Structure formats: structure tokens, C-alpha cells
Amino acid sequence: MSEFSVSLAKLAEEANLTIAYTPCELDKIQVTATEVYRPGILLAGYYENFDSKRIQIIGLTEMSYLDELSTSLRNTHLEKLFSFQPPAIVLTRGMQPLSEMMQFAKQYGVPILMSTEMTSALMGQLITTLNTELAPRITRHGVLVEVYGEGILILGDSGVGKSETAIELVKRGHRLIADDAVELRRVSYRKILGTAPANIRHFIELRGIGIVNVARVYGVGAVKLSESLDLVV
């Protein structure tokens, strides 16, 4: 399990999900699992090794299967799913929740969200967001810039000219991601993503000048929210 969490409200905003039912405000519900799950095997009656921390995705296959079940069997499997109290159940392809789903959602306090996306597309989007938000991370003293599409982390002692180097690169058409404090997240085994803490984003501190808002002085094209780390100097 990740030591970090992300609110269901942020995930819903990122994936453009709509609410069918929620027991409380979505920003009060925290998600800690980096994976999502299609509960087809659980709906077939196999409940072992079910990870209730994952968001559950119900697509056309699962919904078609539920339609073929008898009322009593459908209720049994749906109640079992909701009784695990996952952080949310998401219906894809614009499908509406069954009346039984709404009943058990209210009984067990499980949010039901809806998406118009295809199931695989939504799962990919959610996993990407979860991997970014829940990734292991560290903060390093340095400057992160994008030079010809490559993310370059400039390290060194205080006062050696890291920020001055970065601003000269910005003047030449390259982009600033973070100055002074660089937050590095390992979003996959092969990718480290660098960004700036929100309170200092787009700012750079220069000797003899002070703090400069790079986005205002050089335009929004001179800054970037994040960049993958390709080189350390």
C-alpha cells in the first residue's frame, strides 16, 4: 500500500466522472491503491484475495453478466461487492447504475460514479493519475529545466549559479520546471517525474534581483508543470 493518498474528488475531476451517489463529499474519501480492478470474478462468486482498497470498474461485460443472473443471485453478488466498501465503484460507457446498486451503495456507504469513456481508456487514465499522485517521492535542492525536450536536473552547492544558469536557458527558449526545491516522483520503474511544490511553482530566485515570476516575465511558454528526469548535471 502507498504511504500517500489522493482524494476521490481529484480523481473524479481528472477523469471527468459524474456522481450517481455519494455518502459524503468526494474530497473526504481518500484512495491509497495505485491499481483499479474489474470485479468480474467476484460477481461470479469467487471472493478470495479481493483487494477492497482498489477502485472497482464495471464495464459492459460485467453489466451484461449481471443482467443474465437471477434477481436473487445478482443481489447476492452485488451485496458482497458493496460490503467490501471499496473507495468507489465506477460505471463506464455512460451506463446507469442498477436499482440494486443504488440500494447497496446507500446501505454500505459506497460512492457510485459514472463515465462516458470506454472501459480500457478510463482504466488507463485512472492508473496513470494514481501512479503519479501516489508515487514514492523525494525533494532535492536544485533546478529542473527542460532543454530541447529533455528534463535536466542541475545540482550543486548554494550560490554556485544554478538559478542563473536556468534563467539563461529560459532566455534562449527553454523552460523552467522547478527552482530551489525539486520534487521527484517515481511514477514507474523507468520514469522519474520532476515538479515544483505548489507554493514556489514558476518562481526563481536570482542573486541581486530577488524572486522572479518566470511565467509573467517570459510568458507561459517559458514554464512547465512537470517533466521526466533524463539527465543530472
Where are these regions (language model features)?
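Gly/Thr-rich phosphate-binding loop signature of adenosyl cofactor/nucleotide-binding cores
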Residues: 1-81
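Flexible, charged surface loops at secondary-structure boundaries
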Residues: 48-52, 81-85, 146-147, 225-227
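Structural motif
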Residues: 54-57, 87-90, 110-113, 151-153, ...
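Charged, amphipathic alpha-helical linker segments immediately N-terminal to NTP-binding catalytic cores
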Residues: 85-88, 94-129
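P-loop NTPase nucleotide-binding/switch module
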Residues: 129-149
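Structured core elements
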Residues: 144, 153-155, 177, 183, ...
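Glycine-rich phosphate-binding P-loop
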Residues: 149-177
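Conserved nucleotide-sensing/catalytic segment adjacent to the nucleotide-binding pocket
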Residues: 178-231
